[in-house]
């Protein structure tokens, strides 16, 4: 029984986001996948309810090295972004990869699996987004709590859009968004156990 418990704990914590070597190798493995995700990124950008020329403020939750942030800052040339992540090593890599966008983004280091993480972020944001990140907390109640903390950060008329694995189940996650206060919650795309879903904050 103890062995099983240890195995489950290892599974929950299989990523070593604080290791420079691990983060570097993990990012290299993600590069081919980012090309595959361009379709979902484009759909996400189209779903943001603002004209692309407006100077909107974007929050990327669990931004990692900034793949989604880079894409959105190109799509919204007058936008700025805050990249939230819990790993300094990931933030370092992001700053390297987004050197050409210097001045249009900042990193804020905080752990979204810990209650109160959102207090370190200065909102509101017209668009809050996330890509293949929140599922890493593993615990359904923690995911639910993350959505509750995101809602107050969204500007009235804005949105939260999440491209992630359907784990916890998509139906549950969409219900948690409604519980948090989001309106118009829906799934915009899904396939291969991943989905793009989210909701809006009424004006």
Model features per residue range: what roles?
Residues 144-156:
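A short glycine-rich, Lys/Arg-flanked "PGG" loop and its adjoining helix->strand segment in the class I
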Residues 118-128:
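A short acidic, Gly/Pro-enriched loop at the edge of an enzyme's catalytic core
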Residues 157-164:
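Conserved beta-strand signature within the Rossmann-like core of class I S-adenosyl-L-methionine
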Residues 189-203:
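Core SAM-dependent methyltransferase catalytic element
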Residues 59, 65-115:
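Class I SAM-dependent methyltransferase SAM/SAH-binding core
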Residues 2-51:
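Conserved class I S-adenosyl-L-methionine
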Residues 168-180:
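Short alpha-helix
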Residues 126-141:
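A short SAM/SAH-binding and catalytic strip from SAM-dependent methyltransferases
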